């Protein structure tokens, strides 16, 4: 008697699906896959649409589950056309390395995703597999505290002897983006902005990112207190605010900002630190942190330098000193100087 055909069954946390000759859009496919009822929660789905050389479309899909999903129905992942009675049946595989599948699915770039990709230790090269699994589990946690707890329980040796480095690394990995500044006044409140100052802002903020010049000039604004210069500078867009000293900690400094506001930082201090990097909008430079590893700064953005006249605060007076002649020539080439003689607003800001 012929033997019974082998029953279909795949048990895996990560599934790799390929739908040949599938006319569905990636959005339609993602919507149907999200609505599939499964005993274990779905964590991540990525759908990629690809065209064969003959022009026929097909879809690649990576699905990650919270735990192993035991699939016994080879039609479970079938998709349905919304316009006609057509079913699209996939080739179904358990993905041994979800990271490798993720890279493969990404190769043509026409993708859509839902959820958060779960790091797969099987893709890590070298080291013991068990340690890779524990590290992957820690990285997939939602907070530094949860990740540390996993390491403490499952990698106690690393927790005990590498605690300082662990905390430092996890601080960087789980650091939330700096909270965006919300200006208390609308930009239209500043009705007395000097023409040169407004022109500088319009030429940078009034155009698309692609149209902005490389290494746009910075601007140094000198004026008395309560002239509104800080509020004006902070109302132009997403920025880094460096007040009194320079702090490039990822909790307060973002490489995604459009510009820097340097407020009440003395010119002598800035000269010792990163004058040319910040005022010159230089790209890809490092800053040494007092209690940590050097921070990589993406750069390439201008700075608005704010200062008061006289004393040790005036950048103009500082650059007029004989020993700063070369720095003055460089700064005049890389920055616009504005001296305020009246408030930037009518009323109180």
UniProtKB/Swiss-Prot annotation:
<dbReference type="Pfam" id="PF00799">
    <property type="entry name" value="Gemini_AL1"/>
</dbReference>
<dbReference type="GO" id="GO:0006260">
    <property type="term" value="P:DNA replication"/>
</dbReference>
<dbReference type="GO" id="GO:0016779">
    <property type="term" value="F:nucleotidyltransferase activity"/>
</dbReference>
<keyword id="KW-0347">Helicase</keyword>
<feature type="short sequence motif" description="RCR-2">
    <location>
        <begin position="58"/>
        <end position="60"/>
    </location>
</feature>
<keyword id="KW-0378">Hydrolase</keyword>
<feature type="binding site">
    <location>
        <position position="108"/>
    </location>
    <ligand>
        <name>a divalent metal cation</name>
    </ligand>
</feature>
<dbReference type="GO" id="GO:0005524">
    <property type="term" value="F:ATP binding"/>
</dbReference>
<feature type="short sequence motif" description="RCR-1">
    <location>
        <begin position="16"/>
        <end position="19"/>
    </location>
</feature>
<feature type="region of interest" description="Binding to RBR1">
    <location>
        <begin position="144"/>
        <end position="154"/>
    </location>
</feature>
<feature type="binding site">
    <location>
        <position position="60"/>
    </location>
    <ligand>
        <name>a divalent metal cation</name>
    </ligand>
</feature>
<feature type="binding site">
    <location>
        <position position="58"/>
    </location>
    <ligand>
        <name>a divalent metal cation</name>
    </ligand>
</feature>
<dbReference type="GO" id="GO:0016888">
    <property type="term" value="F:endodeoxyribonuclease activity, producing 5'-phosphomonoesters"/>
</dbReference>
<keyword id="KW-0190">Covalent protein-DNA linkage</keyword>
<keyword id="KW-0548">Nucleotidyltransferase</keyword>
<keyword id="KW-0255">Endonuclease</keyword>
<keyword id="KW-0945">Host-virus interaction</keyword>
<keyword id="KW-0479">Metal-binding</keyword>
<keyword id="KW-0511">Multifunctional enzyme</keyword>
<dbReference type="InterPro" id="IPR022692">
    <property type="entry name" value="Gemini_AL1_REP_central"/>
</dbReference>
<keyword id="KW-0808">Transferase</keyword>
<dbReference type="GO" id="GO:0004386">
    <property type="term" value="F:helicase activity"/>
</dbReference>
<keyword id="KW-0238">DNA-binding</keyword>
<keyword id="KW-0540">Nuclease</keyword>
<comment type="similarity">
    <text>Belongs to the geminiviridae Rep protein family.</text>
</comment>
<dbReference type="InterPro" id="IPR049912">
    <property type="entry name" value="CRESS_DNA_REP"/>
</dbReference>
<dbReference type="GO" id="GO:0046872">
    <property type="term" value="F:metal ion binding"/>
</dbReference>
<keyword id="KW-1048">Host nucleus</keyword>
<protein>
    <recommendedName>
        <fullName>Replication-associated protein</fullName>
        <ecNumber>2.7.7.-</ecNumber>
        <ecNumber>3.1.21.-</ecNumber>
    </recommendedName>
</protein>
<dbReference type="GO" id="GO:0005198">
    <property type="term" value="F:structural molecule activity"/>
</dbReference>
<dbReference type="InterPro" id="IPR001301">
    <property type="entry name" value="Gemini_AL1_CLV"/>
</dbReference>
<feature type="active site" description="For DNA cleavage activity">
    <location>
        <position position="104"/>
    </location>
</feature>
<dbReference type="GO" id="GO:0042025">
    <property type="term" value="C:host cell nucleus"/>
</dbReference>
<feature type="short sequence motif" description="RCR-3">
    <location>
        <begin position="104"/>
        <end position="107"/>
    </location>
</feature>
<keyword id="KW-0547">Nucleotide-binding</keyword>
<feature type="domain" description="CRESS-DNA virus Rep endonuclease">
    <location>
        <begin position="9"/>
        <end position="117"/>
    </location>
</feature>
<feature type="region of interest" description="Oligomerization">
    <location>
        <begin position="157"/>
        <end position="177"/>
    </location>
</feature>
<comment type="subunit">
    <text>Homooligomer. Interacts with the replication enhancer protein (REn). Interacts with host retinoblastoma-related protein 1 (RBR1), and may thereby induce the transcription of host replicative enzymes even if the cell is not dividing anymore. Interacts with host PCNA. Interacts with host SCE1 protein.</text>
</comment>
<keyword id="KW-0067">ATP-binding</keyword>
<feature type="binding site">
    <location>
        <position position="50"/>
    </location>
    <ligand>
        <name>a divalent metal cation</name>
    </ligand>
</feature>
<dbReference type="GO" id="GO:0003677">
    <property type="term" value="F:DNA binding"/>
</dbReference>
<feature type="binding site">
    <location>
        <begin position="223"/>
        <end position="230"/>
    </location>
    <ligand>
        <name>ATP</name>
    </ligand>
</feature>
